[in-house]
Amino acid sequence: MKQLESSIRIEVKTDYIEEQSSPEEERYLFSYTITIINLGDEAVTLKSRMWCITDANGHESKVEGAGVVGETPTIKPNTAYQYTSGTVCETPFAVMQGYYVMVTEQGETFKAPIAPFRLAAPGLLH
């Protein structure tokens, strides 16, 4: 199982969407672009996701669902799949982490962990 998990590399890029945010209403919109790279020897299909989002007040929310952005992509060996999505937070800083549930061509299911990453409005972190 560990070998399967290590065959998937996940890269994240985040952006603060200032023009759609409203700090006076405690509404901070962030986008995140995820690149999922299959370093393994067989294709894998992303079946579902689980996100845990913790804002600066310590409030935690979980988001689970099938696929990503309406797709359940199959990622062939040595290729990547990329998508962009977004989330709204009540604070200008939050941390997201989670995992993707993946299935190999042989039908073996495993979780590909997504390491914690920051969502931050500019000017908050030094």
Curated annotation (Swiss-Prot):
What residue stretches are annotated with the ApaG domain?
2-126
Encoding gene (name)? apaG
What SUPFAM superfamilies would the database entry show? ApaG-like
**What's the name of the protein?**
Protein ApaG
Please give the Pfam families that the UniProt record associates with this protein: DUF525
Q: Which PROSITE patterns match?
A: APAG
What InterPro entries does its record include? ApaG-like, ApaG_domain, ApaG_sf, Uncharacterised_ApaG
